[in-house]
Amino acid sequence: MSSIEERVKKIVAEQLGVKEEEVKNEASFVEDLGADSLDTVELVMALEEEFETEIPDEEAEKITTVQLAIDYINANLA
């Protein structure tokens, strides 16, 4: 089983159509990886599906970087 970090990065790369090497922890979905608002919604849905969790809208709005997504999943899967 790959780590949460690896799984999040793979999902981000697939959802945003970028290479996994471009998906750095500090990367912003919008500013660095070219996501728009629809992309970010679809990204959150993909994370919810992968990790079998529900991310409330008010929390999803705060997840703007790869690291924030990793941190959220780590904190809420325990």
Curated annotation (Swiss-Prot):
Annotated Gene Ontology cellular components are: cytosol; membrane
Picking any one GO biological process from the record gives: lipid A biosynthetic process
Q: Which UniProt keywords apply?
A: Cytoplasm, Fatty acid biosynthesis, Fatty acid metabolism, Lipid biosynthesis, Lipid metabolism, Phosphopantetheine, Phosphoprotein
Stored Pfam families: PP-binding
Q: In which pathway does it act?
A: Lipid metabolism; fatty acid biosynthesis
Q: Which residues carry this modification: O-(pantetheine 4'-phosphoryl)serine?
A: 37
- The answer to whether UniProt assigns keyword Lipid metabolism to this entry is yes
What does the UniProt entry say about where the protein is found? Cytoplasm
**Gene3D superfamilies for the chain:** ACP-like
Q: Where is the Carrier domain?
A: 2-77
Post-translational modification, as annotated: 4'-phosphopantetheine is transferred from CoA to a specific serine of apo-ACP by AcpS. This modification is essential for activity because fatty acids are bound in thioester linkage to the sulfhydryl of the prosthetic group.
Q: Which domain of life is it from?
A: Bacteria
Keyword field contains ATP-binding? no
Stated family? Belongs to the acyl carrier protein (ACP) family.
Looking up HAMAP family in the UniProt record yields: Acyl_carrier
What the entry lists under NCBIfam families is as follows: acyl_carrier (TIGR00517), PRK00982.1-2 (NF002148), PRK00982.1-3 (NF002149), PRK00982.1-4 (NF002150), PRK00982.1-5 (NF002151)
State the protein's purpose.
Carrier of the growing fatty acid chain in fatty acid biosynthesis.
Give the protein's recorded name.
Acyl carrier protein
Species whose genome carries this gene: Cellvibrio japonicus (strain Ueda107)
Upper lineage:
Bacteria, Pseudomonadati, Pseudomonadota, Gammaproteobacteria, Cellvibrionales
